[in-house]
């Protein structure tokens, strides 16, 4: 069993070496997704990537498909990229504009930009005798537990509790300030066709090679 085999993860790391399972074992990877990536603050994107209402940008937080969207109220929302009805993916493209609302391609459920349910087609006849209650919050697109933006950089955490974004960033916040303060008007933006790399490796190998 996973919990029995890696109850003490420190055994995999020695003063002069790291066991290969840390980089190759799928169960350890799943535990890392659960305890690290789906718990801490994760960078989602920059506000300049979604300038207009309905603009969205899709991403991944740990194992969870997410999307960042600009609402009509100009607020930035980070939602799970799936319909609460049957789990169908809401937005398949990397980025785009969803128009007045999100619309699921499976059963045409519609949602506001903040993820709240807007309309269920044929609610009166098609869902008779079921437990579907249009007023239930469970029928809304699920939002990330916490969302914060620092100087246009949007972060989200799937954990409802934990350090604030500024506490999490710590001294690295100076790098954000330095980059923005050098830009005209103290703001930066992500321009179209930004350079993107997909690294087919364990995430730790990539991170260690950047240090």
Where are the regions a protein language model picked out?
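Glycine-rich active-site/cofactor-binding loop and its immediate structural neighborhood
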Residues: 55-105
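Rieske [2Fe-2S] iron-sulfur-binding subdomain
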Residues: 1-75, 112-211
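Short, flexible active-site-adjacent loop segments at beta-strand->alpha-helix junctions, enriched
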Residues: 82, 108, 123
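Active-site HxH/HxHxD metal-binding segment of metal-dependent hydrolases
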Residues: 99, 109, 121
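Extended, hydrophobic alpha-helical segments in both membrane/secreted and soluble proteins
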Residues: 104-106, 111-113
